[in-house]
Amino acid sequence: MSATEEILEKLKSLTLLEAADLVKQIEETFGVSAAPAAGVMMAAPGAGGAAGGEEAEEKTEFDVVLEEVPSDKKIAVLKVVRTLTGLGLKEAKEMVESTPKSIKEGVSKEDAEEAKKSLEDAGGKASLK
C-alpha cells in the first residue's frame, strides 16, 4: 500500500472533531486556509447579476452550524448533537462547548433543516451554511 493510500485510509477513520482539528493544524503548519476561493462559484462566463440568485437555488449541500448554546440547555443540546453525529459523550461535549461549530457537513437541504430544527427545539441556536 502506498503512503497516500495509507493516509487516505487513516483519514476515513477520523471523527468529525478529529477532522476539524486536523484542518486547523494543516492551516497553521502550511499557512493556508480551508475556506473556498471567493471566485470559484462565479466562474460561469457571461453570467449577469442574476447569477447569485441562481447559485443559491442550485445549492444542494448544506452545513449545519451550532452557533450558540445557553448554559441551561447544554445537556439537551448535547443529546441532540450525539444523536445527529454519532459521537461519544466527550467529543459531543467538546463540540457543544466550543461553538460556533459545524455539526453536520455536506447534507441535503431536508436533512440540514431537520437537524437545525432538532438543535433549536433543544434550546440551541443553529444556522445553515
UniProtKB/Swiss-Prot annotation:
TM stretches of this protein: none
Positions of the UniProt region annotated as Disordered: 95-129
Pfam families in alphabetical order: Ribosomal_L12, Ribosomal_L12_N
Top-rank lineage group of the source organism: Bacteria
InterPro entries documented for this protein: Ribosomal_bL12 (IPR000206), Ribosomal_bL12_C (IPR013823), Ribosomal_bL12_C/ClpS-like (IPR014719), Ribosomal_bL12_oligo (IPR008932), Ribosomal_bL12_oligo_N_sf (IPR036235)
Protein purpose: Forms part of the ribosomal stalk which helps the ribosome interact with GTP-bound translation factors. Is thus essential for accurate translation.
Name of the protein in question: Large ribosomal subunit protein bL12
Source organism (scientific name): Acaryochloris marina (strain MBIC 11017)
